[in-house]
Amino acid sequence: MTPYEKNFKVPGRFEDHECTFITWPCKDSDLEIFNYENEIVIFAEKLSKFEKVVVIADPSNFDKAFKKCKNFALIWSIPTDFSWIRDNGPIFIKNDKAEVAGVHFKFNGWGNKFEKCES
């Protein structure tokens, strides 16, 4: 039986959710977001007043993320080289029985436009 047949759906972004994931800026990312660590800290801290925040940090950046965010967020050490969690993070689905599952998509870098994106 497929998730669809079990009435699983991707919830709307406006629906209640358990927490928010944020990726700590990555040095090797092709984006300049590495320059915005302080903004990520401010955002995560403010958001934590309303919901649980999980900061995902590459092991090479874990100590820095932990030091700056430990008082208001959970910090998870997970290998990553991309700062935009929306493009490479988990997608959760739920059904009317309140069951939650994760979906594993093979992210191809927007149609293999970028060599680095082969997850």
Predicted regions mapped to residue ranges:
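The feature marks the mature, well-folded catalytic cores of soluble enzymes
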Residues: 1-119
